[in-house]
Design a protein with these regions (language model features):
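Extended hydrophobic leader/signal-anchor segments used for secretion and membrane insertion
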Residues: 1-137
């Protein structure tokens, strides 16, 4: 499949493009599949810099080690308040205790982000890329 470059589309292949993490969470919660691009190389070679990924809702039991997942962590912001931080990253381990699933989230270079119970979807590579230069014009 040939690499395709696009410039801030509203929709790709019939899926809505969403960049805001909370909006992605809300869409997945309603059963909607969305497109989203990430920057940086922390997911290479699963996802490339500026590549759109298709994120579809997934039940915790459907997540596998090695999947790129859309998940949530809690962090303390500049005002020292706890906030949600949503991201697409790789699941490297899964622990199940009773009904609870815990997912270990890392970069592809094995940098650990931590463990979370909050995984909402699986992200797939598309070979469609955001035109990075167009973002800066």
């Amino acid at each position: 499949m040939e690499k395709q470059i696009v410039n801030e589309p509203k929709e790709i292949d019939g899926y809505r493009v969403v960049q805001d993490g909370k909006e992605i969470y809300e869409a997945l919660s309603k059963g909607e599949t969305v497109m989203h691009w990430e920057s940086g190389d922390s997911m290479y070679p699963i996802l490339m810099h500026m590549e759109y990924c298709k994120i579809h809702p997934a039940k915790k039991q459907e997540i596998n080690k090695g999947d790129a997942v859309f998940c949530k962590f809690l962090y303390r912001n500049e005002e020292r308040k706890i906030s949600d931080f949503y991201m697409v990253h790789r699941c490297t381990d899964i622990v199940v205790r009773g009904d609870e699933y815990y997912f270990k989230i890392e970069c592809t270079d094995n940098t650990l982000f931590g463990w979370t119970k909050d995984v909402y979807g699986v992200a797939e590579s598309t070979n469609i890329f955001q035109d990075e230069e167009a973002l800066w014009k």
